[in-house]
Regions:
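Activation/maturation switch segments at domain boundaries
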Residues: 1-150
């Protein structure tokens, strides 16, 4: 059998910050520190058995929107829905999304920090994958907040 598992979240605008931050993580199957979905109500993430390299085969779907597919008008779907390499993490997917998606998902202040290059995607999360509050982020990097007028 497999000795490793990979955390796979859903690539869309409804994915929780916690699941997005953990997407692509690989653990030994018996590692007590591994995170086992569901991590919250309505969690759609899964653990997938993988080899030691953690690589997946094929593609995975994405929806560059916070709406459910059935709620996206048919004429908009071709621009918002598609497939990416299965090894694309939420962080990598996020970099490819448009400004509207990024601002909606991060919120206006975090988006400004991200867009101005002050904060990489990972910097918004603590080591446990929890989203830092704006106050916590301000304590981590008061200079950036002052310079951007946040």
């Amino acid at each position: 059998g497999f000795e490793y598992v990979r955390f796979v979240s859903v690539l869309d605008g409804r994915t929780s910050k916690l699941c997005a931050s953990l997407d692509g993580s690989v653990w030994e199957i018996n590692d007590p520190a591994k995170r086992v979905p569901p991590l919250h109500p309505n969690c759609r993430s899964i653990l997938v058995p993988v080899e030691k390299d953690g690589l997946l085969v094929g593609e995975r779907p994405f929806v560059m929107d916070e709406r459910r597919v059935k709620d996206i008008p048919k004429e908009e779907r071709s621009q918002l829905i598609g497939q990416l390499d299965a090894n694309t993490t939420f962080k990598e997917f996020f970099k490819k999304t448009d400004d509207f998606f990024q601002k909606e998902w991060l919120g206006p202040k975090r988006y400004k920090l991200y867009k101005e290059g002050r904060f990489d995607f990972d910097k918004f999360f603590d080591p446990e994958g929890r989203l830092y509050s704006l106050d916590e982020l301000r304590k981590l990097d008061e200079k950036s907040f002052k310079e951007l007028g946040l």
